[in-house]
C-alpha cells in the first residue's frame, strides 16, 4: 500500500499513545469506518465527549488518514497479515493492530461493495439538445444584444445504468470551440480504430 507522506504522518500520530489513548483510538477508528460506510454519518461521530480533549486539527487529520488507509486497504483487497505488517511499520502496538484488523475484517465486505459501486468509466454522450437564449440586458447598465445557447447533453453511465443530463450555457464562440473539439475527437477515434 502506497500512502502519501501526510497520510502516513496521520497514521503515525494515531499510533502514538501520547496523542490517542486506547479509548480515543477505538472511537476514532469506528468513526472512520462509519463515515465511509454510512451515508447518513456526519461529523457528529467526532463530537464524542472523549475526543473533545484532542486538538480538532489533529483529530480531523488522523480521521482523514485512517479513512484513507481503510479505503486503500479495501481498494487493494489487503489481507490481515499485509495490513498488520503495514501498521507495524507505522509504529502501531500489537493491541491497536489487532483492533484495526478486526474492524477491517468486520467491515471488509461492505467496504468492497462500496468501492465496487464507484464507476470505472466516463459517461457516454448519447444525445444533445440546445435552445437559443437571447440576452438583452444584464444586471450591468449596458445592453448586451448577443445570443447565448443552453446546451443539454444526455449521457449514459455504463457502471450505474443511469441517464443523467449535463446542462450548461455558452456563447457562440464557446459553442463553436466545443463543436470543433468534438469533431477533432471523433476524427481521432476513427483513426485509432482503423489502426
UniProtKB/Swiss-Prot annotation:
One of the GO BP terms on file: sodium ion transport
Pfam families: COMM_domain, COMM_HN
Compartments it resides in: Cytoplasm; Nucleus
Coiled-coil portions: none
Recorded superkingdom: Eukaryota
Assembly with partners or alone: Component of the commander complex consisting of the CCC subcomplex and the retriever subcomplex. Component of the CCC (COMMD/CCDC22/CCDC93) subcomplex consisting of COMMD1, COMMD2, COMMD3, COMMD4, COMMD5, COMMD6, COMMD7, COMMD8, COMMD9, COMMD10, CCDC22 and CCDC93; within the complex forms a heterodimer with COMMD2. Interacts with NFKB1/p105. Interacts with CCDC22, CCDC93, SCNN1B, CUL3, CUL4A, CUL4B, CUL5.
Role played: Scaffold protein in the commander complex that is essential for endosomal recycling of transmembrane cargos; the commander complex is composed of the CCC subcomplex and the retriever subcomplex. May modulate activity of cullin-RING E3 ubiquitin ligase (CRL) complexes. May down-regulate activation of NF-kappa-B. Modulates Na(+) transport in epithelial cells by regulation of apical cell surface expression of amiloride-sensitive sodium channel (ENaC) subunits.
Listed name of the protein: COMM domain-containing protein 3
Species per Swiss-Prot/TrEMBL record: Mus musculus
